[in-house]
Amino acid sequence: MTRIKRGYIARKRRTKIRLFTSSFRGAHSRLTRTISQQKIKALVSAHRDRNRKKREFRGLWISRINAGIGDNDKKKNIYYSYSNFMYNLYKKQLLLNRKIVAQIAIFKGNCLFMIANEIIT
């Protein structure tokens, strides 16, 4: 059988992986086996954190809404929670998502106060 020389192909594959990990520190950007392991680890983390980011932002929006509603409660001397607020929003068929309501709570607190007054009555 004839000999097949494929050193170029392997070098090309390793170079492609090395370009991906070129910004990593130390041996993670130099040693071939470590490079391939770190590439897999980086891609797994990126995939996991794409979903985690959505979860964390939703939690952030909820805490901002709850804080905004809490500020309004101090003005009116009544207790009004996030869950009651969202329930009343959907009951009145006001289709505002949590991101928009959180932005209203931060930048226009009085608008959130007006919305809360409208849906509570």
Swiss-Prot record:
What PROSITE patterns does the entry give? RIBOSOMAL_L20 (PS00937)
The biological process GO terms on file are: ribosomal large subunit assembly; translation
Q: Which InterPro entries match?
A: Ribosomal_bL20, RIBOSOMAL_L20_CS, Ribosomal_protein_bL20_C
The keyword RNA-binding is assigned to this record: yes
Q: Where in the cell is it found?
A: Plastid, Chloroplast
Residues that span the membrane, as ranges: none
Q: Give the record's keywords alphabetically.
A: Chloroplast, Plastid, Ribonucleoprotein, Ribosomal protein, RNA-binding, rRNA-binding
Give GO cellular component annotations, separated by semicolons. Answer: chloroplast; ribonucleoprotein complex; ribosome
GO MF annotation, one = structural constituent of ribosome
Residue stretches in coiled coil: none
Q: Which HAMAP family match?
A: Ribosomal_bL20
Which protein family is named in the record?
Belongs to the bacterial ribosomal protein bL20 family.
Q: What does this protein do?
A: Binds directly to 23S ribosomal RNA and is necessary for the in vitro assembly process of the 50S ribosomal subunit. It is not involved in the protein synthesizing functions of that subunit.
What is the protein name for this chain? Large ribosomal subunit protein bL20c
Q: Which gene encodes it?
A: rpl20
